[in-house]
From Swiss-Prot:
Domain of life: Bacteria
Pfam families associated with the record: Ribosomal_L1
Gene: rplA
Leader sequence segment: none
Region (Disordered), start-end ranges: 267-336
Residue ranges with Low complexity bias: 306-315
Subunit structure: Part of the 50S ribosomal subunit.
GO process annotations (BP): regulation of translation; translation
Protein name as annotated: Large ribosomal subunit protein uL1
Species the sequence originates in: Malacoplasma penetrans (strain HF-2)
Function field: Binds directly to 23S rRNA. The L1 stalk is quite mobile in the ribosome, and is involved in E site tRNA release.
Biased composition (Basic residues): 286-305
PROSITE patterns xref list: RIBOSOMAL_L1
Stretches the record annotates as Unknown: 246-336
Location of region: Large ribosomal subunit protein uL1: 1-245
Length: 336
């Protein structure tokens, strides 16, 4: 009896899928791998991580905003609407979970946080700004860049209910976002990724030099990261109001997006590796430059300066110099 194994009711784990983690996969291959490597007991999401060439310590190199993907797979958020004159009775007509004015702001200050998103008007921001320690640390503070500070509440509420994803670079310049679910159609997830990459590429900052999108990784919840080779993407265009939308009239395969062209240019300018099989070529011009640099680096020896002969002024020479002890004794003996 002691040697018998205990019988448990745990569900068996899915067999692990072996794949080369150093290899770059196409978007479609990466999505399929992310689905296969999902071993969670719950319905896992497909997450994307986009590494951008940004120095987030600088205020002009931070990216944040909202994007509406072709297919929304996120969670339904509990929405709180704040405006002067609103009450909880108005929540049903607006189609949100909670609605109110200064009374609800007072409840938040006491610790009430039964919501995931705040949509408000500019008039309420002075009161909300006092709750920075409560809302700011949880990422709930409304911001005009995120689109949840507006004068048109019905329109903004409708957009967020359809599915608007907020994005913001972290301290390392990464953007994380859910682009699908493990049971979703692969084609829909691929379309979301293509649109998101083109959208981010269109948001390139003028202060950035070189490649803007450096790396793209895909993974399922609690799954391994999969490197993505971005070789094809949808083409986007900007409307008169500056909104980025998909350009169905353009042929995506014939037009390369900006970040792909930069990637090719960077690969051409890449320096040769220091591997012994591929040694760097040293030309005569480089040798001459090195010699010049070495000459400048060595300090030149100072030429010996000949000492000038000391000219004795006759007027100053007549002054008596201080007598030595031996001279004083000789003077005393001579007087005797």
């Amino acid at each position: 009896m002691a040697n018998q194994k205990k019988v448990t009711n745990k569900t068996p784990k899915k067999p692990s899928v072996n794949f080369d983690r150093t290899k770059f996969y196409t978007i479609e291959e990466a999505v399929n791998l992310a689905k296969q490597t999902s071993n969670a007991k719950f319905l896992s999401s497909i997450d994307i991580a986009i590494k951008l060439n940004l120095d987030t310590s600088k205020s002009d190199q931070q990216l944040r905003g909202t994007v509406s993907l072709p297919y929304f797979f996120g969670k339904e958020k509990r929405i709180l609407v704040l405006d002067k004159g609103l009450t909880q009775k108005d929540a049903k007509s607006l189609g949100v979970n909670h609605a109110g004015d200064s009374e609800l702001i007072a409840e938040i200050s006491k610790g009430w946080l039964d919501f995931d998103l705040i949509i408000t008007t500019p008039k309420m921001m002075p009161e909300l700004s006092k709750l920075g320690k409560i809302l700011g640390t949880r990422g709930l503070m409304p911001n005009p860049k995120n689109g949840n500070v507006t004068t048109d509440l019905p329109k903004t509420i409708a957009e967020f209910k359809k599915g608007i994803n907020q994005y913001r670079t972290d301290s390392y310049g990464n953007i994380h976002m859910v682009v699908g679910k493990a049971n979703a159609d692969t084609a829909k997830i691929v379309e979301n990724i293509n649109f998101l990459l083109s959208f981010i590429a269109a948001k390139r900052l003028t202060s950035v030099k070189g490649i803007f999108i450096e790396k793209v990784n895909l993974s399922s919840t609690m799954g391994p990261g999969i490197r993505v080779l971005v070789n094809k993407t949808a083409v986007v265009k900007k409307t008169a109001k500056g909104k980025v939308i998909a350009d169905d009239s353009a042929k995506g395969e014939n037009k390369k997006p900006a970040y792909l062209i930069q990637r090719v240019k960077y690969a051409q300018k890449k320096k040769p590796s220091k591997h012994p099989e591929n040694p760097p070529v040293i030309t005569e011009a480089k040798k001459k430059k090195v010699k010049k640099i070495l000459k400048k680096a060595k300090p030149a020896k100072k030429a010996a300066v000949a000492k000038k002969p000391v000219v004795v002024n006759k007027k100053t020479a007549t002054k008596k110099s201080p007598a030595k002890k031996g001279d004083v004794k000789k003077a005393k003996t001579s007087k005797k």
